[in-house]
Amino acid sequence: MAAASVLLLLPSPFLRPSSPAHRARCGIATTTTTSTSGRRGLFLFASRCRPGPRRRAASAAVPPEHGLSQPQPQARAVGSYEAALGDAKDALYAALEGMNRGIFGMTSEKRSEIHALVELLESKNPTPEPTDKLQDKVDGCWRLVYSTISILGKKRTKLGLRDFISLGDFFQMIDVKEEKAVNVIKFSARALKILSGQLTIEASYKITTKTKVDITLDSSTITPDQLMNIFQKNYDMLLAIFNPEGWLEITYVDESLRIGRDDKANIFVLERADPSEV
């Protein structure tokens, strides 16, 4: 046998048969034999083998360039969540249009619509432990946009809030570092040349749970004196309506909207406001 030839003996189960073209190109002759153990084998006589055409290594498929910028599932989920949250807030504002914060009453159908939207937002609360993030989420100035506090019937008449006095904005300033809250309720008296004034209620609070605070009334004043003279007779009634004392649970808060429920079963919806408006 030529020196350039090599004799190989391999068990057939471990040998993949070469193609006829490969055997012809390499000058391979094959013959079958049986070993003393009874196992069949294959003899390959290989001479100088001409190299065949090289195959290109398979490479991983590369997605189109535009595919690289497609949002990942998690990003899409976040986007969908934020969109749903925005839609719910828009729907709530639309439902509150013309309701004057609900203080002077509304139909049961409208109340049910508003409360369903409030509960929807509460179920999507992006801040599940708000008292841990009071500085970031709650500190600052807020304006009341809805409340279940109501001034109806004889109360409204006694307080002169039908025609004589108009109820203006309700602001709340929260100082987290001092654990203080100041509520400012604006009024104007038409009969007194559009006299404007306000009821200011100062309170302190203590965190009790991840969602609740206990509130203590510190003081209350009405300014100017002319407005105090109007409310003097029914001042206790007025204070009882707006007294914040008790516990308050923050059920929803983000950068622009806050919802709370108190121990008297009241609901409060507030939006971020500019302190210069107070």
UniProtKB/Swiss-Prot annotation:
One GO term of the biological process aspect: plastoquinone biosynthetic process
UniProt KW Transport keyword: no
Residues that span the membrane, as ranges: none
Transit peptide start and end: 1-74
Family the entry assigns: Belongs to the PAP/fibrillin family.
Role according to the record: Essential for plastoquinone-9 (PQ-9) biosynthesis through its interaction with the solanesyl diphosphate synthase SPS2. Binds to the hydrophobic solanesyl moiety, which is generated by SPS2, in FBN5-SPS homodimeric complexes to stimulates the enzyme activity of SPS2.
Protein name from the UniProt record: Fibrillin protein 5 homolog
Native species: Oryza sativa subsp. japonica
